[in-house]
Amino acid sequence: MVRIGIIGGTGLENPDILKSPSEIVIPTPYGETSSPLLTGTIRGKDIVILSRHGRNHTIPPGQVNNRANIYALQDAGCTHIIATTACGSLRNEIGRGDIVIPDQFIDFTHHRISTFFEEFRPGKLQHCAMPDPFNKD
């Protein structure tokens, strides 16, 4: 069964797009999530929404607890994640309101924990291949 997780950025702090919404809080080994999870349906699809910057938009980008957020969505049974973000473009043909689906990225984040794999014991080291970071399905 497909369950879609949506990580909403700016503008999706308090979404009213879900049918039969309910709120759940999932404890994680990484601390608190940015917001409680909202579950419900959109056009018959099972959806879980998390507000990246908190419901009151009080969490700056560098302080978002990404590991807790991803862990909670997985624990809630999400099989797919769609993340929205508000950003600009360097290309004139991409304007306000356009939707862009990336197939690659450059990670310029700094000073944040960026892995779930913190132990470097023999046989336990994990690497995540990044040549194709997005699922094409």
Residue ranges and their predicted role:
Residues 1-130:
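Metabolite-binding pocket within alpha/beta catalytic cores that recognizes anionic/polar moieties
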Residues 131-137:
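Active-site rim beta-loop-alpha module in soluble metabolic enzymes
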